[in-house]
Amino acid sequence: MNLKTLTMVALATSVVIAAVAQEKAKETLKVELPKPCFTGTPKDIKTENLEAPMGDKERDPIQVPAGTKVISKGCKVTSSDSEPIIGELGFVTDGDKDHDATTYVELGPNTQWVQIDLGKEKQISAACVWHFHGEARVYRDVVCQISNDPDFIDGVQTVFNNDHDDSSKLGKGKDKEYIETNKGRPFAISNVKGRYVRFTSRGNTSNEMNHYTEIEIYGKDL
């Protein structure tokens, strides 16, 4: 075996070792869930882009880099609706995920967003959103975007989008709509860096308002 071949083998081996080490450095994301709180009779929800109901089934586990933690608790929240109908914007990151009249913020109708300022650019690996889990309902046009621009004009990365018909004008999404439960909607975010995280929605199957109980962003300092 000549020197060139040995060098190529050594490089290939180092790549494999690095990949294995990186994989071992990952862990399963653990999301602390609030108690279930469905009230009343479940409605027959009809929507063309709905995922199969989860029931007692668990979502596939999300793998994140070791040391990943909640980086959004207590962070400043702004919104397209500066005067919420119910609640306060601070509820979105206060850590209280339980459902009652004092834990969620209600925004006006049509397309609205809430935006979390992480304070500085962070490495973001996952997120979980709880809109309103007091009953089974589906929120429309749920979109999550990340940017270092607070106005979301430059460098915007869309990491979740179930607006299948582009009715909120943020592009057509491939994710499915889902029924709200106490488990929220967690999703992985692959190697994205940013300071601001914006969640958008456009009403729900019960009424035209937009609600947020809690949003958790998971990541690490750079």
For every predicted segment, state its role.
Residues M1-T7:
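Bacterial N-terminal signal peptides that target proteins for export
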Residues Q22-T41, S80-S82, E106-W113, K122, ...:
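Trp- and acidic/polar-enriched beta-sheet ligand-binding modules for extracellular glycan
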Residues D60-D96:
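Predominantly extracellular/luminal regions of secreted and cell-surface proteins
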